[in-house]
C-alpha cells in the first residue's frame, strides 16, 4: 500500500459533447493512476418497468440518476475502499443483472456524466470541474452515430427523442451547470494540446496539495 493524495475531477457536458473522449485521453496519460466512474451506470433501477415504459422515460433528467449511490461510491473510494459499481445496459434500458464494474481507489478519480454538476453534494466532492462545450449540431450528429451503432436505434427515433427530451433537458438542466466549471473545454479542441494542458494542471494541483499538507489517503495498488 502506498500513501497517495486523491484528486477527484468532474467532467460534464451535453450528450455527444466529447466527455468520454476527453476522459479517455486523460486516462491514457496517467494510466493506472486514474480510475473512472461513469454517471451513465448510475441510472436508477427500472426492472419494475415494462420495456415500453422504459422506452418512454426521460433519461436526461436529474431524477433519472441514483445520485445517492454515486455519491456513496465516490466517498467509499476516498476512504480507500474498492467499489463494485453497477453497469447499465442501454439496449435493455436497465441495469445489467450479470455485470458489475470494479473500481479501485487511485490518485485521480474521473467522474464523468451529463449531470454530475447538477447535484451540489456530488459537485462539492470534486477538486476540479471541467465542462465540455460542443455545438448542438455536432452533438446531435455524434449522438446519432453512436445510438445507431450501439443501440440499433433508427434515425427517426433518435431525432424524435432529441427534440422532445434531450434538447429541452439540456437547456434546462445541463447547460446551466457550466457556471460551476473551473475549466471550459470547447468540443472541437486539439486533443494533444488540451489534454497536455489539463494533465499539467492535474499534476500541479497534486503537487500544490502535497505542499499544503492536505489530507492523504491510503490507496490500494491495482
Curated annotation (Swiss-Prot):
One of its GO terms (biological process) is UMP salvage. ATP binds at residues 13-20. It is found in: Cytoplasm. It holds the Pfam family PRK. Transmembrane segments: none annotated. It catalyses: uridine + ATP = UMP + ADP + H(+); cytidine + ATP = CMP + ADP + H(+). Pathway: Pyrimidine metabolism; CTP biosynthesis via salvage pathway; CTP from cytidine: step 1/3; Pyrimidine metabolism; UMP biosynthesis via salvage pathway; UMP from uridine: step 1/1. It comes from the Bacteria. The gene is udk. Belongs to the uridine kinase family. SUPFAM superfamilies: P-loop containing nucleoside triphosphate hydrolases. It comes from Chlamydia pneumoniae (Chlamydophila pneumoniae). GO terms for molecular function: ATP binding; cytidine kinase activity; uridine kinase activity. Its EC number is 2.7.1.48. One of its GO terms (cellular component) is cytoplasm. This is Uridine kinase. Keywords: ATP-binding, Cytoplasm, Kinase, Nucleotide-binding, Transferase.
Amino acid at each position: 500500500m502506498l500513501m497517495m493524495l486523491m484528486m477527484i475531477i468532474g467532467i460534464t457536458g451535453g450528450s455527444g459533447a466529447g466527455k468520454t473522449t476527453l476522459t479517455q485521453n486523460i486516462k491514457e496519460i496517467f494510466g493506472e493512476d486514474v480510475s473512472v466512474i461513469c454517471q451513465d451506470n448510475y441510472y436508477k433501477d427500472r426492472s419494475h418497468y415494462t420495456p415500453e415504459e422504459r422506452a418512454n422515460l426521460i433519461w436526461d433528467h436529474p431524477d433519472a440518476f441514483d445520485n445517492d449511490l454515486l455519491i456513496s461510491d465516490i466517498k467509499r473510494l476516498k476512504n480507500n475502499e474498492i467499489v463494485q459499481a453497477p453497469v447499465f445496459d442501454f439496449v435493455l434500458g436497465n441495469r445489467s443483472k450479470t455485470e458489475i464494474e470494479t473500481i479501485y481507489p487511485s490518485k485521480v478519480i474521473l467522474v464523468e456524466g451529463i449531470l454530475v454538476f447538477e447535484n451540489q453534494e456530488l459537485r462539492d466532492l470534486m477538486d476540479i470541474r471541467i465542462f465540455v462545450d460542443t455545438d448542438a449540431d455536432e452533438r446531435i450528429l455524434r449522438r446519432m452515430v453512436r445510438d445507431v451503432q450501439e443501440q440499433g436505434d433508427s434515425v427517426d427515433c433518435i431525432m424524435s427523442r432529441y427534440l422532445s427530451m434531450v434538447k429541452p433537458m439540456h437547456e434546462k438542466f445541463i447547460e446551466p451547470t457550466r457556471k460551476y466549471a473551473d475549466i471550459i473545454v470547447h468540443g472541437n479542441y486539439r486533443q494533444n494540446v488540451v489534454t497536455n494542458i489539463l494533465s499539467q494542471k492535474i499534476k500541479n494541483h497534486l503537487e500544490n496539495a502535497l505542499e499544503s499538507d492536505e489530507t492523504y489517503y491510503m490507496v490500494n495498488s491495482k
